[in-house]
Amino acid sequence: INSSLISGAQSLFGVKTQLKFGKTTITGVFSDQRSDARSVVAEGGGTLDQFEFFIRDYDENRHFFLAQYFRNNYDQALANYPFINNNIQITRIEVWVTNRSNRTENVRNFVAFQDLGETSVIGNSGVAVSGGPNAFPDNGNNGLDPTNIGNAGSQLTEQVRDIATVQNGITIPGFNEGFDFAKQENTRKLLEGQEYTLNTQLGYISLNQRLNNDEVLAVAYQYTVGGQVFQVGEFANDGIGATDVDVNSQGQVTNVTNNALVLKLLKSSITSVSQPIWDLMMKNIYDTGAFQLTQEDFKLNIFYNESAPVNYITAVQGSPFGADFEGNPISETTLLRLFNLDRLNYNNDPQANGDGFFDFVPGITVIPQNGKIVFTKVEPFGRYLFDILDNDGNTGNNATDYQADTYTNPNQEKYVYDLLYKATKTAALDEVEKNKFQIKGRYKSSGGDGIPIGGFNVPRGSVRVTAGGRLLVEGQDYTVNYQLGRVYIIDEGLKASNIPIEVSTENNSIFGQQTKRYTGINVEHQFNENFVIGATYLNLNERPITQKANYNSEPINNTILGFNANFSSELPFLSRLVNKLPN
């Protein structure tokens, strides 16, 4: 195509025809496109990858608080990060999950209670609470204490150890499986560092693999506070054997009983937003798609998308914001600062009003090994923003108003996305008009051996490389390994210059992707050897594998129209004029 604004495709399978009528040439293409166009940007030996997502796209079913206590104290603990305002240290943990892999090593039966160790937030009112409202999580806080089974004050009997008789072993009326407790057989224990990571001070775990909705997650953990040891749940080596064997006087086995561990339930196989464990799933962590994050060349910003993306919010007309935010008007405060992600300088030292950049603090604002972004508020776009925008002068009623969806001003009603935390992701679509906060950024991945362009068996001739807008020459500035899908910069000056290098290419689609139909027609009329005009029509549409399209993967049907003209002529007087210029 004789145009720099519209580019054709290289990897096509179909029919091409070229017709000529006098000085008019018509080229038509009707084919299947078996490639995807993409581009990557590299700088200083590494690839710059971009990410963007809206706030509804939190990383669900992967990050969990260990107790309501840790959730309730999370905001306060990180109010003055990087200092963490608590003296808790989790020293031991076991994480158990539904065994989908049929693994036979490190497996146990368990019965898990959502109210185990809790005091202030109880799902079943029949649970007898003995600990104070602000007590640290501990087995002895209520009647579900596994160390007191069958004794005075216990609401459990020994029958709770047998999966077949769990319900009979619970003396609390109206105690329902799937809500108040879950029982599982042959569950597997996850390996710390390989299958999950633990934040030992803030009290949450991050799984490497997202759980399915019907999978169950439970834990036992031990921690210290000022030298005092607390424990929630039972460990596999706490003296509760996996099996009990009864033998008669003749030495014959008369009965074999499998003993279940009593654990703290973090996720049930039934999703119920009205149950306390719904709040244990963290909804303030987002996935960048990176395997490893480093502070070098990492950028992140938060935007509000209305007529155009801006990094601040403005008051609704006729309803000015109330109090300033830390001495500055809210409308003049960047969203990074407003959401407590910019209070440090590059060296992670506190700085008044921040430095304008995202605070990269491993374990607090990022989980580097998994490429996660972590907000320092449990509900940054919910309760936290509700409090920031409150202007009725009575902060004591905020909790009640927020829970009852009672807004005191139009700014709260416009910006607070409370349904994001009170309902499932799907149900949160009922307020999709509030899903306007967007997180954008970029990270630098290791350069390694060449620049990976995201595919294998790249069609020859489809790679285009530019440096700072200048088109590079293959074989002179770079080489391409089309089989491995890598570009190698051979100009040492370019490598050392840190000029952004953009690689655009097409990679052959793998089996099973949506079928793409590529149709195009290009008409050119040549008036003379110096003057050509043309018009182009291109259409690309996809046919999905199934009639039901996935969210964010909807089939496309895009059309491009273009017009171009090309005029060339020799201008000798310009050459003579340039020749007269002094050297």
What are these model-predicted stretches?
Residues 1-583:
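Surface-exposed, low-hydrophobicity segments enriched in Gly/Pro/acidic/Ser residues
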